[in-house]
Amino acid sequence: MTNLRKTHPLMKIISQSFIDLPAPSNISAWWNFGSLLGICLIIQIVTGLFLAMHYTSDTSTAFSSVAHICRDVNHGWLIRNIHANGASMFFMCLFLHVGRGVYYGSYLFKETWNIGVILLLTVMATAFVGYVLPWGQMSFWGATVITNLLSAIPYIGTTLVEWIWGGFSVDKATLTRFFAFHFILPFIIMALVMVHLLFLHETGSNNPSGINSNADKIPFHPYYTIKDILGLILMTTVLLTLAMFSPDLLGDPDNFTPANPLNTPPHIKPEWYFLFAYAILRSIPNKLGGVLALLTSILVLLIIPLLHTSTQRGLMFRPISQTLFWILTANLLTLTWIGGQPVEEPFIIIGQLASILYFTLIIILLPLAGVFENRMLEPKFP
């Protein structure tokens, strides 16, 4: 009798992707984040679905419907806290996943990398529209400030903003359409994830050494299924600890106040995972320039494969590039800190210097380091 797992049209696809998939024998814990992101996505879709059953996307009832979920719905407080903090875990895993890709040269799988960047942008869009839904002060003003940035586009800007708003300000129409976007985007993300995996399985996984591992492959199950389960346990422990003990740790206190168009909060700032981009946006005094810098800060990831100058794939054996990579990491943490600070000295100048350093490291210094390291490795005969 033939094995159903290997012959059934649907089960065969699952088997080839998660059971019999040949994987490098030496991939480290940095390769766990892909599966963790998949789990995060499932958690967010499931909790989001239950929240959508009780939420109302109308300006007069949105805030109180969220309060109703937390007070009156069975375990509603838990579902909401898991969903809100699940977004933070999602971005934490995303940043580590992208960082791994940059460090180990995984971006040389160009199709997988480009789909990944599109996924990052889509997840950011989903998180942004989702943050507007509770209709608190920071939800309302965050939506107003960020959508207003589109007015910097020459000629069509103002029309575009009013078209997105569905009126002359952020109001009922905006909230309703943002709820629709927030509902549909995770399913688009799911489809993109499948394409991401499709391209990855065309080439097979990269590994820490950066060299071809075809000669030494092991089956995904049981080796990496067990390893992924360990990652899952650790992540869910952190998530549940956060959701149960300090669910509001990463949120903004202003969002406990219902949206009021007549009262501006003292400091308008997004959630922690957008602060680095927000700092880059604010570091340029010109509106259009800031918007372009904001976009470029993410889209620069698309040109990283073109900036690869080294003869080696990853940074495993390249100490100069490694140093620059960790400076870039520290720089991103600095930008995250600056994004949460008020617009005053010395934060303005620190933000501007960190923004310049961010682009300089990626576009100039890392490619130059690659060339320099190549020269150092050239054999020198007497």
Curated annotation (Swiss-Prot):
Pfam families according to UniProt: Cytochrom_B_C, Cytochrome_B
Which spans are transmembrane here? 33-53, 77-98, 113-133, 178-198, 226-246, 288-308, 320-340, 347-367
Indicate where this protein resides in the cell: Mitochondrion inner membrane
**GO CC terms:** mitochondrial inner membrane; respiratory chain complex III
Binding residue positions for a ubiquinone: 201
Give the note describing cofactor binding and stoichiometry: Binds 2 heme b groups non-covalently.
Q: How does it sit in the membrane?
A: Multi-pass membrane protein
Q: Which residues bind heme b b562?
A: 83, 182
List GO molecular-function terms, semicolon-separated: metal ion binding; ubiquinol-cytochrome-c reductase activity
Q: Partners and quaternary state?
A: The cytochrome bc1 complex contains 11 subunits: 3 respiratory subunits (MT-CYB, CYC1 and UQCRFS1), 2 core proteins (UQCRC1 and UQCRC2) and 6 low-molecular weight proteins (UQCRH/QCR6, UQCRB/QCR7, UQCRQ/QCR8, UQCR10/QCR9, UQCR11/QCR10 and a cleavage product of UQCRFS1). This cytochrome bc1 complex then forms a dimer.
Outline what the protein does.
Component of the ubiquinol-cytochrome c reductase complex (complex III or cytochrome b-c1 complex) that is part of the mitochondrial respiratory chain. The b-c1 complex mediates electron transfer from ubiquinol to cytochrome c. Contributes to the generation of a proton gradient across the mitochondrial membrane that is then used for ATP synthesis.
**Something else known:** Heme 1 (or BL or b562) is low-potential and absorbs at about 562 nm, and heme 2 (or BH or b566) is high-potential and absorbs at about 566 nm.
Family (UniProt): Belongs to the cytochrome b family.
- Report the protein name in the record: Cytochrome b
Native source species? Glironia venusta (Bushy-tailed opossum)
Q: Which gene encodes it?
A: MT-CYB
